Structure formats: C-alpha cells, structure tokens
Amino acid sequence: MPVSRARRALLSLFILLSFTLSSCDGFSLEDIIPDLGSDPSDDVLVEVTFYVQIPLNTPEGEEIYLSTLDEVTGLGVNASAHPMEPSLGDANIDQGLVYQTTLTVPQHTIIKYRYTRQNQYAVIEHTESDEQVRYRMAQANNPLEIRDVVSKWSDTSYYWPEPGRISGIISDTTTGEPVPGMLVIGGGVQAFTTASGSYMLPGLPPGVHNLVVYAPDGSYHEIQQGAEVASQANTEANLAITPREYVDVTFLVTVPIGTPENSVRLVGNLYQLGNTYGNLPGGMNTIPSRMPKLTFAGGNQYGIIVALPVGTEIRYKYTLGDGFWNAEHTLDGSFNMRRFIVPDHSIQLNDEVLSWKSGTKDSITFDLWTPDHTPSGEEVFIQFNPYGWTTPLPMTEVAPNHWVFILFSPFDILSDLTYRYCREGECGIADDAATAGLFPAGRGVTPSAEPQYIADTVEDWAWLESAPFEYNTPLPVIRTRGEDFVTGVELMSGSKPADSVQITSAIPEVVNLNGGWIVLTPTWSLTHHNPPVIEPDPDQDPLWIDLNTMTMTALSQGLHVAIHPQPHFPEAVENWWLNAPLDFSWWNSWFDQYHAYAIHFAETAQIQGAEMLVLGGDWIAPALPGGKLADGTPSGVPADSELRWIEIMNDVNARFSGTIAWEMSLPAGDPAPEYFEHVDQVHLNWDPGFVINPDTTLEELVTIGNLSLDGEVHDFWSSWLRPGGKDLVLRIQYPSVSGWNPDCSTADDGPCYPISAFSDPAPVVVDYETGFTEQALAYQAFLSTAPNQDWVSGIISRGYYAPAILHDKSISIHGKPAEKLLRDWFLSLK
C-alpha cells in the first residue's frame, strides 16, 4: 500500500534516530577474538634520496617537485609536494639538469610518487607516448638512492634520444612457475604481467630507472632494482619473487557517537581492501563494493578479521563511504591514514576514529524513498559531483524502498556540490529518471555550519518499467537434446572496475537461468593506434584477480565456464580500422599484439580452469585472409596472413587443453581457412533477418528462421564444419525494440542500426521505441527452430547485462520477458 508523504516524514524521523544511535544488541568481538595485543609501531626511520634528470626542453625558472601520492584517498586529491634542488655536479648538464630531494620515512614504506613542475599550474610528467605518469614506486627497506629520468612533461615534447624498453618474465621462487597479474613499474610506465609472467615497459628514455615488481594483493614480496636502458635497446629483467604467508589481523575500532549503524568499512592500499589500481572518475581509486564491511561489536565498536600477507605494508583508514568521501579525519580536519607492517603472527589492532568530519561544516542527511517497483535485492547508490562525478556510494536501506546516507566530509575542501541516485552503482545507466544520463545537472546542495536534512523521492527509474510484464509467450515445443548440447548466456563486457564485483555477485542469477554455461567476456584495451597496442587497462579492464574470482565463483556454483576475450576500442571499431595506417610494419605489430593477446587468454583459461576458450569475432575481420574494411575496400592484410593465423591457433592449442571455439558471422562464400583445423566449435552470430512489428506473428518468424537454417546456415555448416566434424553453436540476440530492420541494403529501408548499436547497456537509439514483446517473440522463434536441427549443437544468448536489471533497448534479456522464456526453455531441456 502506498505511504503518504506525511507518514513518510514521521517514519523517516523514527528510523533516522535509530539509524544513528548505538544499538544495545549484537555480538561482542571479545567472545570470538582472543586478546592478541596491538602491533608495535615500526619506529625505524630511513632516508631515501631521489635524483631525477629532467629533459633539456624543460622551461627555465620553474620549481621541480617530487609529489608523493595517496592511492587510498585518491591519487588526484591528496598529493604532497616536496621541493627539489638542483644537483649540478651529478650529471652532464648538456644531458639535462638533475634535481634531488631526501625523504625520511618509516622502514619498509612503499612510496608512490611522480614528478611535477610548478608554473601557474602543476605540470605533471608524462611518458614518451604522452600518457600521464600514474605513479612511480620505491621501497624503503634501508637508506637508499633512487635515480629517475623524466621522459617529458605534459606541455613539452619528447626530447631524449630514441627510447628503449625493459622486458622480462616474473616467476615464483618456490615453483619456478610464471606469476600473472603482478604490477611492474619502471620509468613511470606500468604494466601487469600476463598469464605467462611476461611484461614489457616500452618508451623509456636512456638512463637508469628504478624497477619494482609489486603484487596488487600483497601475495608476493616486492622486488626493487635499478635497470639501465639504452636507446633503441631492450633491457631484459627476468625476476623471481617469493610468495608470502597469511595471518589473521583483527581490526577493532571505536567510532564517534552518532555513527550510522552498519556503515563502517575498511579501505586500504591492497586489492582486497578496495584498491582498483585504476583511475576512477574524480581522481579516486577505490570502490566500496570491494572494501571489507565491519560488524557491530557492541557499544561504539566495530570489528572484522582479515587475512593479510606477512611483511606487507598496509595503509588503511576507516570510512562510511570510500577513501575520499566520509573517510575518517584527524581533529584538525586532515585525512587520517594508518600504517603497519603485517607481522608473522596474528594480531589485533585497536583503533579509534576521532571524527568523520572535516572543517566547520556539519553533516547532510539524504533521506530517500524509491518507487515500489524498485527490484528487490538491488542496492541504491548516491553519487556526488564536486567538480565532476565521482565513485557512487552505497546507501543504507532502513526499510523497504527507504534509503539513507549521511554525508560528513570532506566539506573543508568543497563548497557547492550536486548529487544523484542510481541503482547498483550504475550511475549514468540505471539512474533516477530525473537525473539520467552521463552528464546530468543533478540535484544541488550547499554544505553549511548547521546539520541539513534532505528528503528526496525517486519518482521513477530510467530504463525500468513500473508495471510488471505479462508473461504470456508460450514455451516452444521441446525437443530433447543430449547433455552435450550447449546452452547458456554470454555476459555483456564490463567497462569499469566495479563491474567485476557486480558480475561475480550476479552469478547466482545466471545459475537460476538453468543454462549450464556462462561465457565470461574479459577485455583488453586498444591503447595505441600506431603502432597498435592491445593490453590490460585497469581503468576499464578486469585484473587477473578479478577474472579468477569470476571464474572460480562460476565453477563453484556448478556452471561450465567459457572465456571469450573482447577488445575495448577508443572509438567505433569500423573507424579504428579505417584510420589505421595498415602498412606492412603496422600489420606486423598488429599480429604480434593479437598473438600475445590470444596466448594470454589461452593460458588464463588453462590456469583458471575454464572449459572453453572463444576467439575470433567480427572485430578482427579486416585481419583475416582477404580482409576488407567497413567501406568495402581491401584492408591490405599481408599475403601470408593465413600462415600467421595458423601459427596463432597452433600456439593457442599448445597452451589450452579445453574446447577452442571461433566466433564469426556468416562468411561471404569463401572456403574454410586452414587455421580452422585448430578449432573445435564455431559460435555463429545467427541473424535470420527478423523484422518484428506489433502485428508480426510467430508463424511468420518461424518460416523466416527455418529458411535461414535450411539455406545459408546449413550451407555454411556443410561446407565449413561437417568435413572436420566441428560443432556449430548459434549465438542468438535481438534488441528490445519494435520495428528494427537489420537489413540496410537500400536507402528506403528507413533508420538502420547494426546489432552492435544495441550491444551496450542503455543505448541511445531514438528512432525505435522499446519492444520487450518483440524481443521475446524473436527468442520464441529462435527456440522454435534452431534446436530442431540435428547439426546445431548449442544455443548461447549473448549480451546478458549482469550488474542491474535494465528495461532498455539493448540485446540484454536480464529482467525482460525473454529471460523468463529462456529460463523455462533451459529448464525443460533438462
């Protein structure tokens, strides 16, 4: 029954009082945690002297600084600048001035830093490829000297001799096996080791660079050494790292009176403490969904036990938001940061948060009511915009559809700000309809010296229907297929670090679809165009740990796992290819990059226990033998491309023992390529050409589907697959729109959008209205035709958007009528 606004106000007051008062029940950590004593502080201090050589084209008369960075609060929001002095006698001035400074830090400190120049603004150092240096790293185990070279500044050109590079393999000292997912840093360039333990740091100016290998989760001891790089040369640095043991660390914290209940989290510098090692919007680097949440322990205390690696430096703080919003502060208003070295025995840390506030401004309480059709089990987040939209923060549900968030800080460095609400942290996609989109104005608020209470209501959510769907689509006639018949869903690729957490959390929903298979779609990014570079970018691609967590979770819940790697292009894939040089040198680089990409995911699938690896895809069509660009012109792929693909697939087979599948669309009548000898299955993007309007009948679609199957699809199977005994799995997809016409062959066909236009969440396609019945009808036709063909070996629904239910125009079936139809059909096959 709807609740009146007056009744909501009274209910809100009652709940808010109980929300901020300490509870008298709950368990005490004293009942389960022995008094182990606090960890003694590491009082030994060491001096670290930094020498940096700057390029000759550095503007004169400007101060040079070493900026130490705080990845817990945010690299972009809490740096400390240390002035440097010229060290004229240390190097040949004709090669660039050398500056120096000395820091005194606790022993075993990991220093994250970069160099800046100060004029009217702070000018940050950049790499040779003109990317901002994220940070360099140094470990202060003993007094030492660090020597660095600045490649260039953001406002200058590269002025050194031709750069060189550092490359190598990182292995485990105890097993000799390669170690994937390690962060390797040198010369301001960062890379993560591949599944084979390999890494490469390109674009380094000649000179000595500090090289550090660091485990994002602290699972291995760090290694640090100098590496000399010569112009146009490779410095090989193969290093062995030692794994760490783990001990239990108990965090027990006393919080201020008035702390909202069950909102205290632990945020720190390791992966398992919320660090993404990527650059999030607003200069942040941590996500609440990965931060450990503390348990109420009576009084004003909260606690948690976390297994941490011995010898690791832990930087941490307590927070009611993330490392920036609502984090703990000292009494003078500064961000508080705690530090300790994990000992070789279990310990208990007894901490006290002095204040959640900073400055003289008081808290703001956001009291939100959401509509009754908000999906059960989904969380509501609030997102703030002080100078740009920052990481969304989870609100606390105090009653059904009633959410609260109290903002305490950091008001000392903020004035006006705007905010908005969204579901499941998917701001920009699953928004409050009043503030929807990537760049909305938002709702406004100005912090003040007095506490503020803001009562908000989300009247409607973007891309979420208020009325329940009518599920009246009849189930197709079931034809029993054997256990080898492949059924499942392929996930839509993520585009931000939090997506990996949400995908992992959504795996039980995939299990409930009864399909049996989940196709994970990890990504690498095309970060450079000439020469082409494809590599993991933690800003948008999952780390090794992320993919391993997703795979292990799916396997543990009884799913078969396939890994289907995908690219992240900086622009439309067609334009990327059209704008590429496509000369012989460029093609050599492209094949080298794709080879490394394919090998990495083959080894990843083998190590992580996936049963299938899917390669190919329409995005590589210009690189296949006889490849063409989107405008129909030849791509200029080398004449020996067939041999290059054979080599790639040979190497993939040598590294992965499971099923190897190839994704593709129907070819243009060409014979099967020779590299198909190394493929076990083909996953065909089946498009029978359905055009579905409100008056379209199932019988019409079944006729069209059967014509496609009996004609072009059967011809493809009989000529490409049957001779080699290879299986054909059909990938099915249809957008949730009415009247979509996939045929763009004539100008009279009206608006034309390829299926790729609907392959991302919440696509903006104004020419079509949503059509959920149409999507379900397409699925009914798919399932009424394809499984009846003996030579079809499986059905995969592609584009399942896991993070949240969206009633959008995309191909995702999550939360739409087609999902129920597919779930029931999968179940009936069992």
How would you name each of these model-derived features?
Residues 51-60, 159-180, 251-261, 365-376:
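Structural motif
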Residues 56-108, 118-138, 189, 257-311, ...:
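Aromatic-rich carbohydrate-binding modules that target alpha-glucans
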Residues 118-160, 216-238, 244, 320-360, ...:
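Structured interaction patches on ligand/partner-binding surfaces of diverse proteins
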Residues 473-481, 513-532, 545-629, 802:
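Substrate-binding cleft and catalytic face of glycoside hydrolase catalytic domains
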Residues 475-479, 747-757, 767, 773-779, ...:
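Aromatic-rich peripheral "rim/lid" segments of glycoside hydrolase catalytic domains that contact
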Residues 506-508, 512, 520-572, 601, ...:
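Aromatic-lined substrate-binding rim segments of carbohydrate-active enzymes
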Residues 564-567, 612-618, 637, 642-670, ...:
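Aromatic-lined carbohydrate-recognition surfaces of secreted/lumenal glycan-active proteins
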Residues 601-602, 608-617, 664-707, 726-727, ...:
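Aromatic- and acid-rich polysaccharide-binding/catalytic face
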